Amino acid sequence: MPKPTIRPPATVAVSSSLRDARKRRGIGLRRLAEKIGVHPATLSAWELGIKVAPATAVAWILGYLRVESAEYDRVMALAPCAGDANLVDQSDPQLGHLLWTYEQLSTRVVEWAPLCIPDLLQTRAYAERGLDTAVVQDDRRDMDLLSRQVRQQALNDGTRRYVFLIGDQTLHDLDDLHDAQIDHLRAASQLEHVTVRIVPSTETALRSIGAFTLFEDRSGPIAVVLRHHHCNTYVTDRTMLSRYHGTAKALLRRASDEPVSPSALRAPALIRATR
């Protein structure tokens, strides 16, 4: 089997930003390539993240496209890191943007969520409560909700497979949001391209494994993201990808096909994961 195409996170961020900026201006790829003096195939490779665009070329393209100063600064801060295998992403607008871009590059997304419902499976009420009760409030609330909405729509479209591994304690801590959130999980689990599995909290060895999302194409893992309160860490180092891929497999083996606690879930069968 061929190795997966690994695109470093900063490369993905810069390339997608160049492509989005060009499309917003309504300029065709060939026209822009002619204006900046490069071959269309070269510009296409930069926009797809197949090749790393030199920082000088990135600056020239952004200037020609007349992007706003905040966007210019954000992209130019990433440009020197374009070849790095890993990235700590601190830029607010990019938090959802890079995550979404990797999802689009994937044929399967595997998420391990030991302590909370995964973003893509949250009801709006659950998401709003999480944002409103955060230890440190910030101004990302509306942007965060919009990003989730876009990604949830993509999940419903069925363009890729999703596997969600949820710690059972998460389901016990829903309080007054319980019924609506459980119904939402049930509905999602009925989709042919979505698998939801519950991992028992009695699995002591799993308690030290923090949340992560693994992105895969048909050849294997292409990136993993570790999400934090003020930033995201994206990893594409092949050794680390292999380890997280192995961890995801181990979690799947230990997950339950049947509900862990019927009394807590208030239903005879929450999720049956047979796919």
Question: Locations of the language-model features?
Answer:
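C-terminal regulatory/effector modules of DNA-binding transcriptional regulators
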Residues: 176-275
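Interdomain hinge/linker segments and adjacent boundary elements that couple functional modules
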Residues: 2-25, 29-34, 41, 45-173, ...
